[in-house]
UniProtKB/Swiss-Prot annotation:
Disulfide bonds: none annotated. The gene is mdj1. GO terms for molecular function: ATP binding; Hsp70 protein binding; unfolded protein binding; zinc ion binding. A zinc finger (CR-type) spans 227-308. InterPro entries: DnaJ (IPR012724), DnaJ_C (IPR002939), DnaJ_domain (IPR001623), DnaJ_domain_CS (IPR018253), HSP40/DnaJ_pept-bd (IPR008971), HSP_DnaJ_Cys-rich_dom (IPR001305), HSP_DnaJ_Cys-rich_dom_sf (IPR036410), J_dom_sf (IPR036869). PROSITE patterns: DNAJ_1, DNAJ_2, ZF_CR. Residues 1-66 form a transit peptide. CXXCXGXG motif repeats lie at residues 240-247, 257-264, 280-287, 296-303. It comes from Schizosaccharomyces pombe (strain 972 / ATCC 24843). GO terms for cellular component: cytoplasm; mitochondrial inner membrane; mitochondrion. This is DnaJ homolog 1, mitochondrial. CDD domains: DnaJ, DnaJ_C, DnaJ_zf.
Length: 528
């Protein structure tokens, strides 16, 4: 009666009589009474136009009580629901049939009902049914799902990908998105497994890869140049020797996961009508867990223990600072405690960062090495031989005359070897001319003579060497003064100005003849 009423509403036909609507409304009242709903007696009084409106409202309440909703569509019909048939009956095989028997039966029926061989419309529908049945039975997962849950594991002919045991027990192992996403891993939304970033899944067994370890080691400059072998100690997770990585005590067994009921999957609902299936985070998708009283006492059920490990690292010649070396299989061991009976594991890798100490006087630039050599100015001017250190020992270098600061000598092929090749860089010697800041009187005298010899008029001289005169002039004037008995005391600027006047000449002569008379001229003037 309810379906007839809906049909009449969808098609726009109002063929219900007052008596029919009254009967429907009476049934809804009786149903509401069984559900302990109180309906006012005044609602039983209705008339021609209100009959259908009240009946529709009461039927909506009845549908809500039965957890059922309907949608009236006037123009577009919903897609027909595909009712799945028994694939075993379709192919004519038993549930214990092998894969080869199922395949043989499929080829036999497909050849018989193929549209090219049988153009009948019924044969085409039969061929589609045969193909769908074979797709279910040839896939081990789909076959297992159908054997366990029947057609409920398929929606509109499509495999949902998970077990549906939770529907029989109040959606066990499922959680709602409206309740704070408990137990939901967002990585599964994008295709990542919740079993950890290092877990890789296979159709027949699980392979667990341990986490990688990062460490650092410091070496000397010459060890990086020549290569070395260094020992590195670090903390690592190793497989437990008591349980061999299973996490169980001897003779113990795993139990079914309580969160997912052994399915390894959890179902999450997205209102209004979407659902998502993710890997169970309690068991890691295996469907089994280790009971607390069965866990290994050495590793507490984890399958791994922490310990110190030492590995020997071969450092190749020519390695540079901050270079990372990879040691395969020297990382953490993977635990198989959450894996299945065929789970396998592989340790991670060790990534060692090499730090090179700086050298006191060698400067590295890639494979080239630079050494700054300091030479005195006499060697720079006259040339000579200089002993400098290199990567292979001391070497005597010839310094060309006139070498200045910034000049460079290149020793090709004497640098650092390029890693994993036979090529070497260059060794450069940069010259830096050093000049003394403090001079002895003898050194200053020699330099002044050198300045005179080079006609360097800008060099500063002491008082014994008048500026602006060369060595020959000073020598001749000195000899003439000694021959005449005249002192060689230096003269001031005022006296030089008076050299050309007669008064100046007699004044100087008087001072030389009567030195006592001129000791305190100011005093004589004051007394007079």
């Amino acid at each position: 009666m309810f379906s007839k009423y809906l049909q009449s509403r969808v098609c726009g036909l109002h063929s219900f009589t007052n008596s029919s609507a009254q009967q429907l409304f009476s049934k809804s009242i009786a149903h509401s009474s069984r559900r302990n709903f109180v309906i006012s007696s005044s609602c039983t009084k209705f008339r021609n136009v209100a009959i259908q409106r009240n009946a529709k409202r009461e039927f909506s309440r009845c549908a809500a009580l039965k957890n059922f909703s309907y949608h009236a569509r006037c123009f577009h019909a919903t897609r027909a629901v595909w009712e799945m048939t028994d694939p075993y009956k379709t192919l004519g095989v038993s549930k214990s049939a092998s894969a080869s028997e199922i395949k043989s039966a499929y080829y036999k029926l497909a050849k018989q009902y193929h549209p090219d061989a049988n153009p009948d419309k019924a044969a085409q529908d039969k061929f589609v049914e045969i193909k769908q049945a074979y797709e279910v039975l040839q896939d081990p997962k789909k076959k297992k799902a159908f054997d366990t849950y029947g057609a409920g594991a398929f929606k509109n002919g499509e495999f949902t990908g998970g077990d549906f045991e939770g529907f029989q027990n109040g959606f066990a192992g499922a959680s709602s998105f409206s309740s704070g996403f408990p137990g939901f891993n967002f990585e599964d939304l994008f295709g990542f497994s919740s079993r950890g970033p290092q877990a890789r899944r296979n159709t027949s067994f699980d392979v667990f890869v341990g986490e990688d370890i990062e460490a650092s080691i410091t070496i000397d400059f010459m060890e990086a140049v020549r290569g070395a072998k260094k020992d590195l100690s670090y903390s690592v997770s190793s497989t437990c020797s008591s349980c061999h990585g299973s996490g169980l005590q001897p003779g113990s067994h795993k139990s079914t996961c309580f969160a997912c009921k052994g399915t390894g999957q959890r179902l999450h609902f997205i209102p209004p009508s979407f659902h998502m299936q993710t890997t169970c985070d309690s068991c890691g998708g295996t469907g089994t867990t280790i009971p607390p009283n069965s866990a290994c006492r050495s590793c507490m059920g984890s399958g791994t223990v922490r310990e110190r490990k030492t590995v020997s690292i071969d450092i190749p010649p020519g390695i540079d600072d901050n270079t990372v070396l990879r040691v395969m299989g020297a990382g953490n061991d993977a635990s198989t405690a959450k894996g299945g009976p065929n789970a396998k594991s592989r340790p991670g890798d060790l990534f060692a960062t090499i730090h090179v100490r700086k050298h006191p006087f060698f400067v590295r630039e890639g494979t080239n090495v630079t050494y700054n050599a300091k030479i005195p100015m006499t060697t720079a001017a006259l040339g000579g031989t200089l002993r400098v250190p290199t990567l292979t020992g001391n070497v005597d270098l010839r310094v060309s005359p006139g070498t200045s600061t910034g000049d460079r000598i290149t020793m090709a092929g004497k640098g650092i070897r390029k890693v994993n090749t036979s090529r070497y860089g260059n060794f450069y010697v940069n010259f830096e001319v050093t000049i003394p800041k403090i001079l002895s009187p003898h050194e200053r005298s020699l330099l002044e003579q050198l300045a005179d010899a080079l006609n360097d008029s800008t060099a500063r001289r002491t008082q014994s060497s008048p500026s602006g005169t060369n060595s020959s002039t000073s020598t001749s004037s000195t000899s003439s003064k000694h021959s005449t008995g005249i002192s060689t005391e230096p003269t001031t600027g005022e006296e030089n100005k008076q050299d050309g006047s007669v008064g100046g000449f007699f004044k100087r002569a008087f001072r030389r003849l009567h030195p006592d008379e001129d000791q305190n001229p100011k005093k004589d003037e004051s007394s007079s």
